[in-house]
Amino acid sequence: LCIAGSKKKTELPQKRKKIGFFIGNNFYDYLTAEENLHYYRQLKDIKDKEEVKRVLNLVGLEGVTSKYGSFSMGMKQRLGIANALLGSPEILLLDEPINGLDPQGIADIRTLIVSLNRKQNMTIIVSSHILGELEHTANKFGFVHQGTVLKEITHDDLKVKRSAVQIYVGDLEKARSVLKQNNIPVLQESSAYKSLEDYYFDLVGGKRCE
């Protein structure tokens, strides 16, 4: 295990403090967002009480006084991310952060993740089965199959390595025979890229639902 460039077992406990984890929501229904986070702040031995307000502001839950039990799914996910942000970690691990959300909730979490990455200069690792959504959010992808990382690519790799061009012409039959001569007017040309989902199934095999 290597964290922040270190493999020394004696350094791992300290290095782990630089990582924030979001794995499900373990909060008390009868407490507010702020009360729940103060509980976890103390568990993490964070002395600064203002840290709770800071992370609530980052995820857009500042001023919310209702109990956790009345939260929407999107609010619960935001609070889970806020908990992971306590202590200003350098790396944020998010496990299925958009699971169970409606389209608006997904868009909100996507915006939040991008904002944290850009404004807080934070490395964010997202584990998700919703590949189409990752394609809109991430800039680097790692494909894991049966516990093994098969390949890592960048967003640009996805386009460059798996690109195709579709050309629409007025006479398809004629185009098939004389296209190489380059003397047929092209009515429309567009670039078509394989999606992240397409790339995954090409890599590991299997068939997706159409």
What spans do the regions from the language model cover?
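Catalytic Walker B motif of ABC-type/P-loop ATPase nucleotide-binding domains
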Residues: 92-96
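Hydrophobic anchor residue at the start of the ABC signature
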Residues: 81
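Helical segment within the ABC ATPase nucleotide-binding domain
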Residues: 106-120
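Conserved ABC ATPase "signature" region
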Residues: 38, 49-64
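Conserved catalytic motifs of ABC-family nucleotide-binding domains
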Residues: 88
